[in-house]
Amino acid sequence: MGFRTLDDVDVTGKRVLVRVDFNVPMSQGKVCDETRLKRHKETLLELQKRGAKLILLSHCGRPKGQGEPEFSLRPVVRVLEKIINQPVAFAPDCVGVAAQTAIEALQNGGLLLLENVRFHPGEEKNDCSFAEALAHNGDLYVNDAFSVSHRAHASVEGITHLLPSYAGRSLQCELQALEKGLDNPKRPVVALVGGAKVSSKLFVLNHLVEKVDYLVIGGGMANSFLAAQGVHIGKSLCEHALMQTIKKVIEKAQEYQCTLLLPVDAVVGFRFEKGAPHRLYDIGDIPDDGMILDIGTRSIAHINEVIDKAATLVWNGPLGVFEMSPFDQGTIAVARHAAECSLTGKCVSIAGGGDTVFALNHAGVANDFTYLSTAGGAFLEWMEGKVLPGIFALRQA
């Protein structure tokens, strides 16, 4: 994979700085979702068992380079202790005397969580002096957070120039899964891309048509593709300014022999609200006052037929307005079929992005996919074919 892992280092008695992603949703000082915390369990327990002194680095929220209580990592401590069944100490800063004092008290196998690295402006600026202050507290560095590896920040990229650097198990596992998705996949490869706007995923689409055999477009994005082909879409969400750009994507798909699939029917609502009056229409018959809010039954069947052909499936973005019933049914139906194909070994299935994870959980199949990435921006940038600064830095370390 081009970088060193925990298999390549003796950590006994070493101060190991571990970059984790504890950027979790909180409400009134309580953690609302433990998913990201659980992703690091294997790495932390392995290092603890091997006698390392673990010093955890993370950000939380966007505190604008200064301490803000609502973004403190302190509430994470109790939840993390429950997950790993080990005591976790907390330091009220990530550098300086407070951090150093807490680190000096660590025993072999001890765990310490430092306060939010974004409480310092040097973190997001990738400031050399801040990276040096972080590195001063460790003997080696482990990146276990793919979800932040698209950021050229001090605790992700800068620090790798100052300490021997390694990939943690979570990062290693994620990269191995993603490699199976687009870098070295089994074919045919099917990509499902949904969501509201083409503009947010234009680079993704342009990259995917070069890589995959079938590209399925759903969600609000599909409306813009349909409009670009002259289809009347009523009052549906559409990015009319992108018509020429979308036509170029369609032409590129033809050039690379990538089969593009768009909805052939749709569930059309007449108000944008839960339980709004709705009807099923063929794509050529969308009424003037209607809004396409979900894919229809024939579209579901077509997509499922394509998934049946897949050896590799990559999914990002819901296929309808999944947060509003009954316009979640298309996403649910396709998700359950994809999960069944994955469980029976017909395909390797990889899904990622915040809305995608939420939608698959909503469908009750999140655990049935081969790999589910909790990364948002990093997953999208990987789908765009970009080099992620945190991963590149590990390969150079």
Curated annotation (Swiss-Prot):
Keywords: ATP-binding, Cytoplasm, Glycolysis, Kinase, Nucleotide-binding, Transferase. Belongs to the phosphoglycerate kinase family. ATP binds at K201, E323, G353, G354, D355, T356. Pathway: Carbohydrate degradation; glycolysis; pyruvate from D-glyceraldehyde 3-phosphate: step 2/5. It holds the Pfam family PGK. This is Phosphoglycerate kinase. It comes from Bartonella quintana (strain Toulouse) (Rochalimaea quintana). GO terms for biological process: gluconeogenesis; glycolytic process. It is found in: Cytoplasm. Substrate binds at D21, F22, N23, R36, H59, C60, G61, R62, R118, R151. GO terms for cellular component: cytosol. PROSITE patterns: PGLYCERATE_KINASE. The keyword Glycosyltransferase does not apply.
